Amino acid sequence: MSMQDPIADMFTRIRNGLSAEKEVVSVPFSKMKMEIANFLVNEGYIKGCSKGTTLAGHPSIEIELKYHAGAPVIEMIKRVSRPSLRIYKSHEELPKVYGGFGVAIISTSKGLVSDRKARDLGVGGEIIGYVA
């Protein structure tokens, strides 16, 4: 049986890893998930990410989770647009996550950007998810 929403699965693995206080979580590899992981590194929500392989030889992404004073840096990570219901917004309609303290991950024609950067560039796109 195939996975219906790989990005939602990635977010769930990160959430579960944080609640179990894991240092590293592994997710199956895809270019989009690697882009999202690099985005989270650049925004400071995770320590790092690297491409690896599972014991079965399948490519995977190793995500190093980040904690501050014993508490997870990521308080909330949520999938918004999903395969059965895509959510697109123009740059004027982009939401502020947690009153501007969080970040919306937006897939635009300029690549994967934060909601702030999309507003600055004047581009809209698909809202992949929210992180705070």
Swiss-Prot record:
GO biological process: translation
Entry keyword set: Ribonucleoprotein, Ribosomal protein, RNA-binding, rRNA-binding
InterPro entries in alphabetical order: Ribosomal_uS8, Ribosomal_uS8_CS, Ribosomal_uS8_sf
Domain of life: Bacteria
GO cellular component: ribonucleoprotein complex; ribosome
Signal sequence, start to end: none
Pfam families to which the protein is assigned, alphabetical: Ribosomal_S8
Statement: the UniProt record of this protein carries the keyword Transmembrane helix: no
Entry's Gene Ontology molecular function annotations: rRNA binding; structural constituent of ribosome
PANTHER family: 40S RIBOSOMAL PROTEIN S15A
Subunit structure: Part of the 30S ribosomal subunit. Contacts proteins S5 and S12.
Family label: Belongs to the universal ribosomal protein uS8 family.
Function: One of the primary rRNA binding proteins, it binds directly to 16S rRNA central domain where it helps coordinate assembly of the platform of the 30S subunit.
Protein name: Small ribosomal subunit protein uS8
Source organism per UniProt: Francisella philomiragia subsp. philomiragia (strain ATCC 25017 / CCUG 19701 / FSC 153 / O#319-036)
